[in-house]
């Protein structure tokens, strides 16, 4: 493109330019020129505005305006060619133009400001991961903030301070000590759990050396050093040295052992989260970045493997840690947890550069100061329960002495001995008297009990006279430390952080008693020491939102500034916190989701540490920083109390697998003793009317619903032909629409590629549901319609997953929220269509019915077009799917159409509406919507796995299958159906939950075992010792069962030669659609749908996988994380169940999401 430089002499141009340039540059005088100046000082005589204006054109006004606008906004739309136009403008000006020089300077400044100077990130190996001691955070100042370096000073102390300050013991006894009879609960009912995290944060960045108070033994970064250690030796002590794991339920800090047990239990959750993370990282192995050695003697390779996993796992765990700090801790501090808002104070905000502002620096490092060491001493918030625990623990350490009266020297000596007696090996330490189990971990139920009691424990309030007496020696030491540091006064510090100084003792604290004591000790507010002053300050009142922590006024402001500095200054939380550094999955796993809990994220920590104790919507796991009773009031006010469970955590019994075909059939056929578990989810999605839907229960009403649905689905005689043709035509259309040539040129055959799962199989089923139930789809290039095709597919999968695949407790609430929103939208659209259908509205609908009566033709009318079998023109709910030119052809000029099933669907809806005379809304939510929910996801899953089998292990069958597909006869189609069902049986992975409602015993066997030669664990072997594997399972009431249809499909007792494709198996023998009273009601339709899509795919010339990982389905043996690494699986036998990942591998998925295929062709299908 050439940008014109045409000179525009429009009237008034000179005046407009002169005004603009005067506004930008001002009216400056030319400098005086001296004729006898030194030779090297001569400068060209600058030209003025008049000369500039003569050179410029009308379009240059726009260029200057765009330049100014870009400078103010900090964003340059390069499609406007601003840079090129500025160069053209500058090139027109005289060489010595004064204004031209300023514009050039501005352009250079803009280009300079586009980059960091100096850079804040580096590709050096020494900067990839956190160092154990925190060094190398700032790549230019590697020791900044490292452990074992001096504290910083924030505030210059200028005020003359009394050389004889008040006695520390007197300060404590008059301003700080708590009267045991006058405990003040926190005004916002914050639980002790928040202050346990505060304790971890404090000891993460402040650990004063007992030998030199000026030295900080830990780093100045929030890097979880209490868990990981402060140096290399401490870090190696908590690591197993294998697979990136930490030793089970360990943490580095000895000091934590001396705190209430909830602090240690909190750290153990981070330990377990870390081990969960590295286990999943190794499983996914994104891009092959974690190279597992192939030989046991490759010592260096194993060390690299372990370290890469450990360091990446640490970055991810710290990422969750900082998101908990910002998303849960800071939100509670600001009382945002009481407001219906997702706003949060997140220092990692992305600021743009502009003329009016520059972004706050980031990744510059940090060095904590002595002032903030004092700010973070919050002993007044110790609860009554923890006061008693601490007093007893200190009394025991003191040999029976009361810590409230013991000398400071005795207390320090006793605490030193206490820490000395703690084993150096973290795995040998205990917590609250708990005993380690054989796997090295503590008992989950006992840890959960500690956490539950801590969540229910109301913390203390801030303010004077509220520090437990047992902390007397600790507080006296703190006052003495502050004096050795020569810190500034309270007022000096307040001025430093931008607050007004206290002008009176009353301003500091209106309590007359406190005022009198302060006046006696310090004479003037300006003389009050920082630490005693903070402890004596009044606490802020609650504001909702605004003030939730309610600390002293100075603390309230200071901690927010410090939080911003700690996070924004940390390279690993800013410029290097990227999916590339911590993997897509790791980035996603640690991230907050504003759609869940308003951005709170601590539930991930609870659920990964204790997956079998907290319900998916437990308020204990989602909001532990406020006691449950107060949370109940908060959520009632927000109208969200019914979203959460208020029951205390409780261990759930392990899931019992049922594996053999005989046992599977026995369980699935018995509705009396084994009940389906889908009812609550179906009710959640569709409301009370859905409780009688076929799959929602095992009562007579559910059975009646099943019979009604089957009758409605299969009543039309022509339904098989309708379904078959729909899927064949639709599949061709999707291949044409989404396939693209990737090799070859010219008019000859070219290699095409398509994501067959995402863009063909899934969308074919989604289109079927849209056409059948008149869900309006958006046409290509248009905005009309309620759904894009992929959007509808995702909605259907999400709804299905909430009912049948809700197995990840951590993501369950998010899944339920998303599925509920999708179901509500879908229900409303279907109900609207049903009402219009019942009213008989729509001209084309009436015309179609009339034509049907007159001609007897098979007429399908929708809202926008007509299909007749004589003309072959199809439309869906909104029109014709075309390739952009309006018509698809098969090469012979015959139009390809996107067929509609609307009349078939409308008849189906009419039949469903006839049930029991229910209202439209009741029928839609109770029958129609559940039918829609049940269709797409499972069919996509089965066909994807079937195709995967035949493009891999079963490829020897492809030539015969392709031959059959090309015959296009009913006999050939029947054989293709058998091939399809066999592929689904061999590679499909299906299981169904059941609940035991009466004590039972089931005889079961293990029909197949893992194949050691198959690293994917997808191909089992028949168990040669199946008779010896016989066992009787004692099932008590309440037991959850997973009825494994995958193992049943590989049981030789039911399927001889289970690993071979055999076409002599009866269609009714297959179990991947279920067995018994709840066998899939839509199985006949599904069979035709699957085989029809498969048929079209087989007709592709040269059908094959795309090369490399793109052509493979990434899957892993399904297993439930047991809460800690090293625990043996509850049922180690082969299950055949698989888990998958999203296409970008950022999340696990219950079904395959992507697989690319290639074929040869000219693009016509």
From Swiss-Prot:
<feature type="binding site">
    <location>
        <position position="204"/>
    </location>
    <ligand>
        <name>Ca(2+)</name>
    </ligand>
</feature>
<comment type="similarity">
    <text>Belongs to the peroxidase family.</text>
</comment>
<dbReference type="GO" id="GO:0052879">
    <property type="term" value="F:9,12-octadecadienoate 8-hydroperoxide 8S-isomerase activity"/>
</dbReference>
<dbReference type="InterPro" id="IPR050783">
    <property type="entry name" value="Oxylipin_biosynth_metab"/>
</dbReference>
<dbReference type="InterPro" id="IPR037120">
    <property type="entry name" value="Haem_peroxidase_sf_animal"/>
</dbReference>
<dbReference type="InterPro" id="IPR036396">
    <property type="entry name" value="Cyt_P450_sf"/>
</dbReference>
<dbReference type="InterPro" id="IPR019791">
    <property type="entry name" value="Haem_peroxidase_animal"/>
</dbReference>
<dbReference type="Pfam" id="PF03098">
    <property type="entry name" value="An_peroxidase"/>
</dbReference>
<feature type="active site">
    <location>
        <position position="376"/>
    </location>
</feature>
<feature type="binding site" description="axial binding residue">
    <location>
        <position position="379"/>
    </location>
    <ligand>
        <name>heme b</name>
    </ligand>
</feature>
<feature type="binding site">
    <location>
        <position position="219"/>
    </location>
    <ligand>
        <name>Ca(2+)</name>
    </ligand>
</feature>
<dbReference type="GO" id="GO:0052878">
    <property type="term" value="F:linoleate 8R-lipoxygenase activity"/>
</dbReference>
<keyword id="KW-0408">Iron</keyword>
<dbReference type="GO" id="GO:0004497">
    <property type="term" value="F:monooxygenase activity"/>
</dbReference>
<feature type="binding site">
    <location>
        <position position="223"/>
    </location>
    <ligand>
        <name>Ca(2+)</name>
    </ligand>
</feature>
<feature type="binding site">
    <location>
        <position position="225"/>
    </location>
    <ligand>
        <name>Ca(2+)</name>
    </ligand>
</feature>
<dbReference type="GO" id="GO:0005506">
    <property type="term" value="F:iron ion binding"/>
</dbReference>
<keyword id="KW-0413">Isomerase</keyword>
<dbReference type="InterPro" id="IPR001128">
    <property type="entry name" value="Cyt_P450"/>
</dbReference>
<dbReference type="Pfam" id="PF00067">
    <property type="entry name" value="p450"/>
</dbReference>
<keyword id="KW-0223">Dioxygenase</keyword>
<comment type="subunit">
    <text>Homotetramer.</text>
</comment>
<dbReference type="GO" id="GO:0016705">
    <property type="term" value="F:oxidoreductase activity, acting on paired donors, with incorporation or reduction of molecular oxygen"/>
</dbReference>
<keyword id="KW-0349">Heme</keyword>
<dbReference type="GO" id="GO:0020037">
    <property type="term" value="F:heme binding"/>
</dbReference>
<keyword id="KW-0479">Metal-binding</keyword>
<dbReference type="GO" id="GO:0004601">
    <property type="term" value="F:peroxidase activity"/>
</dbReference>
<feature type="region of interest" description="Disordered">
    <location>
        <begin position="1114"/>
        <end position="1134"/>
    </location>
</feature>
<protein>
    <recommendedName>
        <fullName>Linoleate diol synthase</fullName>
        <ecNumber>1.13.11.60</ecNumber>
        <ecNumber>5.4.4.6</ecNumber>
    </recommendedName>
</protein>
<dbReference type="GO" id="GO:0006979">
    <property type="term" value="P:response to oxidative stress"/>
</dbReference>
<dbReference type="InterPro" id="IPR010255">
    <property type="entry name" value="Haem_peroxidase_sf"/>
</dbReference>
<comment type="function">
    <text>7,8-linoleate diol synthase is a bifunctional enzyme that converts linoleic acid (18:2n-6) into 8-hydroperoxy-8(E),12(Z)-octadecadienoic acid (8-HPODE) and then catalyzes the isomerization of the resulting hydroperoxide to 7,8-dihydroxy-9(Z),12(Z)-octadecadienoic acid (7,8-DiHODE).</text>
</comment>
<feature type="binding site">
    <location>
        <position position="221"/>
    </location>
    <ligand>
        <name>Ca(2+)</name>
    </ligand>
</feature>
<keyword id="KW-0560">Oxidoreductase</keyword>
<dbReference type="InterPro" id="IPR017972">
    <property type="entry name" value="Cyt_P450_CS"/>
</dbReference>
<feature type="region of interest" description="Epoxy alcohol synthase">
    <location>
        <begin position="666"/>
        <end position="1161"/>
    </location>
</feature>
<keyword id="KW-0575">Peroxidase</keyword>
<feature type="region of interest" description="Fatty acid alpha-dioxygenase">
    <location>
        <begin position="104"/>
        <end position="448"/>
    </location>
</feature>
<feature type="binding site" description="axial binding residue">
    <location>
        <position position="1080"/>
    </location>
    <ligand>
        <name>heme</name>
    </ligand>
</feature>
<feature type="binding site" description="axial binding residue">
    <location>
        <position position="203"/>
    </location>
    <ligand>
        <name>heme b</name>
    </ligand>
</feature>
<dbReference type="GO" id="GO:0006631">
    <property type="term" value="P:fatty acid metabolic process"/>
</dbReference>
<dbReference type="InterPro" id="IPR034812">
    <property type="entry name" value="Ppo-like_N"/>
</dbReference>
